[in-house]
Structures are given as structure tokens and as C-alpha cells.
Amino acid sequence: MAQSAVVKNEIIEKFKTHEGDTGSSEVQIALLTDRIQYLTDHFKTHKKDHHSRQGLLKLVGQRRSLLDYLKKKNVTTYRELIKALGIRK
């Protein structure tokens, strides 16, 4: 299922760095995290949905790449974002 426009806009508003920001690394990571969480919940009930699992792995790799880029670019923003999203345990 695609993200609803309302949820997507809420995430963008929360993580934007400036007005009109929809494509910064922070926003992209937050949107990917939301999709990953949705798919993770989906797999709790649909254990044999292997096709979607491939998509999940692709999303996780995409998020990992963006996180690596952000860490290289700005470590403090990286740490704040991870804490806000609750990614690392």
C-alpha cells in the first residue's frame, strides 16, 4: 500500500530543513523508515509474501545509503535523525 498523502505530508513537515523541502536526505530517510515499518508489520501477518520482502530489502538498502551519506556530510544531524526515528537500538 502506498503512503497516504496526509501521512506523507506530516512526515515532510516534521523533518524538513527549510520551507518547501521535500527531497533532503532527512526527509527521504524518514519517508523510507515509515514505509519499512509498514512492510515490517505487513510481514507479521503475511509470512509468505516473498515478493514484497524483496522490495523491503531494497528499501532498507536505499535508506542505508542515505544514512551513510548523511553521516559523512553532517554527523550531528545524523545522530539527531536516528534518535528521532528510533532506528538504532
From Swiss-Prot:
SUPFAM superfamilies: S15/NS1 RNA-binding domain
Family classification: Belongs to the universal ribosomal protein uS15 family.
InterPro entries in UniProt: Ribosomal_uS15, Ribosomal_uS15_bac-type, uS15_NS1_RNA-bd_sf
Pfam families: Ribosomal_S15 (PF00312)
Xref: NCBIfam families: S15_bact (TIGR00952)
CDD domains: Ribosomal_S15p_S13e
Protein name, entry field: Small ribosomal subunit protein uS15
One cellular component (GO) term of this entry: cytosolic small ribosomal subunit
Keywords of this entry: Ribonucleoprotein, Ribosomal protein, RNA-binding, rRNA-binding
Role noted for this protein: One of the primary rRNA binding proteins, it binds directly to 16S rRNA where it helps nucleate assembly of the platform of the 30S subunit by binding and bridging several RNA helices of the 16S rRNA. Forms an intersubunit bridge (bridge B4) with the 23S rRNA of the 50S subunit in the ribosome.
Subunit structure as annotated in this protein's UniProt entry: Part of the 30S ribosomal subunit. Forms a bridge to the 50S subunit in the 70S ribosome, contacting the 23S rRNA.
